[in-house]
Amino acid sequence: MAFDNTVVQIFANYCVAAAESMAYTLVRTAHSTFIKETEDFSCALITPEGLAFASPRTLGATWYIGLDYGPVLSRIEDYRPGDIAMTNDPYSGSVATHTPDIVMWKPVFYQGMLICFVGGHIHNTDMGGAVPASLSRTLTEIEQEGIRFPPVKIVREGVLDESLLDIMAANVRVPKQNRGDLMAQIAMLHNGEKRVLEIIERFGTADFCTGMDALLDYAERQARQVIATVPDGDYFFAEYADEDSVAGKPMRLALNLQIRGEEAILDYTGSDPQLASSLNMPTGGMVRHALALVGYHYVLYTLQDDILLNAGLDRPVRCVLPEGSVVNAVAPAAVGMRSLTCKLTHVLTFGAFSRAIPERLPACAAAGLAIMSVKTMDSDGRTLMASLGPVGGGAGGMPFGDGSDGSGANVAFLRNTPVEINEAEVPILMHRYCLVPDSGGPGRYRGGLGLCMEFQVFSPGTMVTARNRDRTHFASWGILGGQAGATARFTRNPEADHAEALGNTDIVHCQPGDVIRLVGCGAGGYGDPLDRLSEEVLRDVRCGYVSPERARTDYGVVLDHDRVSEEKTQALRRSMRDQSRVLPDAPFAYGPYRDAFETRWTRERYAALTDILASLPVAWRFFIKHQLFDGLAARYDKGEVVEGAAVIHELFEQLMKRYPALSPQRDSA
C-alpha cells in the first residue's frame, strides 16, 4: 500500500484510537483518584526501537509524547508473547522520571514475529520513602524517594510475578491502592495489544510496519515546516524557580535556542548545577529526552494544531544537557520533584521562541502548579491517603484571546478532582475551591486566573504535601505590553489570629481543626491592558474575575453603577498612556521581584557563576553556588559599589583560599 498523506491520516486515526482505548481502560479500572480523575498517566504504541508512534489526544498527561523507550527495551534480554516488563528507576534508562511513575511495556507478537510494543506509565500516589507521596524538595538522594525497580518482567508469558507485588506492598503506604492501579495498568496493556492486533488484521503485517515509519516521517515533516517559519537566529531566555532547596536560593534555567532553517538546537548550558534537593531532572543527557522537549512540543502545537503527536516531531531538534546540571542530574541525586523543573522548561522554551516570534505565541502560563495530597486517619484509625489534585493557574493571554482560567498546558492538562470525591476519599472538609479574582496578568488579552483550594483536616498526625510549590516570588511574565500574573500564597489557618504563611513549604504537619489554603498564581497578560475593550473589562468585573478597583488601576476603566463611564475611562487611559514606562527587557514584563533580582544577578554575572561551577566536580557545585550568592549579598549589605562580573571571580578566589581542598578538586574536574 502506498502511504500518501490521506492513507497516513487514516492509519493514524486507527492507531490513535487504539491508544485512546488503552487510556479509557486505565481510567475506568484504576483505583487512585490521581489516575482515574486527575489522569496522571500516559500510554502509547511504540516501535520495536522504542519510539512512540501514536498517543491519545484526549486523555492522560501530555508530557510524554516523545518519550524514548529504547534504553529500557534493550535491558530485557528475551521477549516472549504474554510478557510485560516494568521499571520506576530514573537511573535505569531515564524512561521512568521519578519513582512514583511506574512504566510498563508489553511486546506485541503476530504470527510469531515481534511487531511493536504497547506501553505507558502511571503515577502512584505513594511508593514509600521518607515522606507520604514519596516527593519533597527536602529529599537529597534517590534512596529517600521510595522503592525502585530496575527494568524487570512483572508478567512472564502471561503469569504475574506476585513476588514483585509483595515487595512493593511491603514498602508503600497504601498497598491495596498500588496493587489495584498496577492491575489496571496491566489491563491497559492487554487492551492495547488487542487493538493493535485488530489493526494488523485490517492492514496486514507489512503495511502496519510501513505505517509506523510513515507516521513518524509525517510528524517530522510537519515539525520541520513549523520550525522553518521561525527566523534563523540565536535566542536566549532564562527562567527561575523561587528556591533550589528548602529556604534556598533562586534556581535558574537557561536556554540558548538556535534556529537554522528546518532544525533547532535547545542548549541548556548556563542552567544551575545539580541540586541538593529533588528538583533535578534525570534526562541521562539524551539529545531528545521528553522532559527537555515539553515546551518544544507545546510551541509546535500552538503554531500548528493538526500535528501528529509522536516521536517524529523530535527528529529536527536536539538538546544540549550538561552533565551534573539540574537538567541532567547524575546518581544519586534526588529527582522526585523534577516536574517543577520540567514546568519551567515549558515556559522557558516559550520565552526563547517568543524572542523570535512574540506576536504568534502566548504570554507565560501560570507555572506554579502544586499537587496536593493528604495522609490522615479515619474514625477507625485506618491510614488513608489521597491526592486532592493540582492547584495552579491558567494559561497565558494569547494573540487572539484570554488565557484559560485555572488550568492549561502548564499542568500537562491534568484534570481537577471533584470536591465530593476528595471528601469521600479522605476525612476532610472543603471550604472553597474557586478561581482567584485579580490573579490573571492584565493585558489586551487577560492571563488565566489562579485556583484557590481551602480545606480543613480533623485527625491528629495528618500530613499535607504540596509538591512543586513555587511562584511565591517570581511571577509569570506578560508580553508585548501585557503584565505579569499574581504570585501564589500558601497559608495555615488563614482567618485565624495565628495565621501562618507557609511560603514554598511542601510538607505540613497538621493538628486537628487546621485549615490549609493554597492560592495558585496567575498567568501573564498579552498586549497593552489599556487596549482591552471596556466591555470586556466590565464583563470580567461582573463575573468576579477582576475587581472594580483593578479595572481602574490596571485597565483604566472607570465604572459607575455597574456601567462603564466612557468619558472618564478615555480621560484616565490618556493619562495612563502618558505615564507608561518602557520595559527593561521588551517585550517581556517579569514583575518586580525578577526585575530586582536581575539588577543584582545580571546575565553576565550569572554566566560567570555557571562557568565557575561547570569547572568544579559535581559534589562541590551546589555548595559553591550558595557561597557565591551569600558573598554577593554581603557586598550589597555593606553598601559597597559592585560593578560587572569580575566580582563573581573575586568572590570565588576568596572561596579558594577559604577551602584549600577546592583547588585540587577544580584542577581534576
Residue ranges and their predicted role:
Residues 1-81, 86-110, 114-668:
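Glycine/proline-enriched, intrinsically flexible loops and inter-domain linkers
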